[in-house]
Amino acid sequence: MPKNIVVIGAGLGGLTSAALLAQKGHKVTVLEQGDWIGGKSRRIEVAGQVIDTGPSLFTFPGVWETFLAKYQELGGKLPKDLEFIRLAEVGRYFFRGDQIDIPVPESHQWHKPWQKFVAQHKALEGPITTLLTSAPLDLKALPALGKLLNVYGTRLSTNNYLNSLSWMPEGLKDLIAIHTLNAGVSPDQTLPIYASMTAIMSEQGISVPRGGMNEVPQLLAKLAEESGAEILLGQRVMSISKHAVKTQERSYSADVVVSSLDASLTDALISGKTAKMAPNRSCSGVAIYAALKNPLPAGTVTHSVVMPDDPADLYRALKSNSSPNQTMSFVNYYEPGHIYSNKKATVAVLLTAPADSADYDLKTPWVRDELDRVSNLIGLERPIDELFEDFKVLNANYFEGFGALGGALYGAKNPLWQSGPFHNPSYRSLTKPWLYRVGASVHPGGGIPAVMGGAMNSISSLI
Ligand SMILES: Cc1cc2nc3c(=O)[nH]c(=O)nc-3n(C[C@H](O)[C@H](O)[C@H](O)COP(=O)(O)OP(=O)(O)OC[C@H]3O[C@@H](n4cnc5c(N)ncnc54)[C@H](O)[C@@H]3O)c2cc1C
């Protein structure tokens, strides 16, 4: 029987759910508090140039393909799919005075161990995609789980697993381990699967849709609307109950509620109590988006990763929610006409930051120091912000405005045993069978593959 379904939030989690549920024939209304589609994946203009904020790299394309296949199975017609442009490298990493591209080139001393590592993880690409798109404890996922256990054995964290690889140089371990920050947590708090992700990304490559990342939520919204879903912007949900979702303006009756909000915010809207900041939280970011007066020097790659000299020190700072001495930064650089049809070059400098609600800007001492360090390491003669024509800074305070308290990008940080199939919260609870949870705070990992996979898993019984 078609149901009245209210989806809360028009980010990637909400839109993935809305497209599939509407295509299945349910009556779907999406309520979004902001005035844009995409949540953290937002499109802005800086000095007349189009820049997408939030996610910048598209990984694990098998999850996207699984979504499209499900949409078609339900009878949906696909418009032209996105054109994914594979970047020449996974990234150029700057670490302790060295500069290393991934995949590690033959000329680098780490080439052999890197090749060995990639070879050991090659067979896990399919199983990881299966696990990302399978409900917890789904029997069909057991063979995939078996393949992972064959590689990791009893090593339960990324750190434990990497430390067991006696043949691997310590620096290479650090470089692989830092990728757990893409899930907002340190490598002692994540499953070993995160180590494999680096190797798989190196094989599969990373990509960006032509036109930019915001093309992803735009296409999802189009599929949802073409399937009959109604997407209402500027509708802030004030309370959620078994039969109704209330905004400031009106009440929407609902047989089912799909919430893509941070789990703590969903709970607060149900209980009527004020949401509490989780003591242990995933990281936030200071994200600086700029249009440049002139392109960066020739040879600057699209995606650079500037590592801290002492990753352990950064993990400690993030755990105690204090400012780091040095952090891990992404520098995403687009030449004019690359990916976007911009006339000017643009850059995003994304500094990993504590989830402390702060309103940091370029004058904040640790941000200033990091910008200078990043500029120097990527080979600029002047601080990068001297090349900005105009810029915009998004920080923990901004992310808190529509997400988890503190600005934690992936919500609360759960104990290790809850970072797999037993994740907390679960997609559904026994006491509230009408509530389905999706979004970055639910499926471990929190990036686009986890959010889209998690949404498909959560609502599977409804489609
Ligand atoms: C700087 C940055 C870089 C990133 N880089 C990558 C990357 O390269 N690759 C990758 O895979 N992932 C990346 N991520 C993660 C990825 O962006 C997120 O995991 C994903 O976008 C989260 O989607 P979501 O639907 O869970 O949440 P959101 O996008 O936060 O959506 C939730 C929506 O709910 C709305 N909302 C909140 N409260 C209410 C309310 N009361 N009523 C109505 N609506 C409400 C919000 O406005 C928002 O639109 C990055 C994130 C950031 C911030």
Short names for language-model regions:
Residues 3-123:
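N-terminal glycine-rich phosphate/pyrophosphate-binding loop and immediately adjacent elements
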Residues 94-189:
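Rossmann-like flavin
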Residues 238-342:
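Mid-domain catalytic core of redox enzymes
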Residues 55, 440-462:
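A conserved FAD-binding loop/helix module that cradles the flavin
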Residues 171-183, 380-444:
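A glycine-rich dinucleotide-binding beta-alpha-beta segment and adjacent secondary-structure elements
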Residues 196-239:
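Helical element adjacent to the flavin cofactor pocket in flavoenzyme catalytic cores
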Residues 295-397:
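C-terminal segments that line or cap access tunnels to active or ligand-binding sites in enzymes
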Residues 83-85, 230-234, 436:
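General small-molecule cofactor/ligand-binding pocket signal
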